[in-house]
Amino acid sequence: MTYSANDTGFEFYGIGIATAPHPLGPWTKYDDNPLMTTDLSKGVSSPGHNSIVRTKDGKLWIVYHRHADPDCRKPSFDRVVCIDRLFFDKNGKLKTDGPTSTPQPVP
């Protein structure tokens, strides 16, 4: 399961992962959390509120929003929609190349 944590109006908002053996839990947070968080070097602030989709070719993508102002340091609800690839690394951990602030190819 992915989830958003912290206050969406601030830079500490981000996306985390939790796993469980059953839909009702118990849930365990991923050791490598957060999956995405603010990265001002990439021009990204406060990624969150996400969905994961699988394309016809089997690739996973994460669709999320982030602050439109990449240097957000105050409450802001001006958001843009983003999409980035998700993949499992050689150890079976869910990873992404995101968050990004650049256009991505249409899946």
Where in this protein do the model-derived segments appear?
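Carbohydrate-active catalytic/glycan-binding domains of CAZyme proteins
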Residues: 1-107
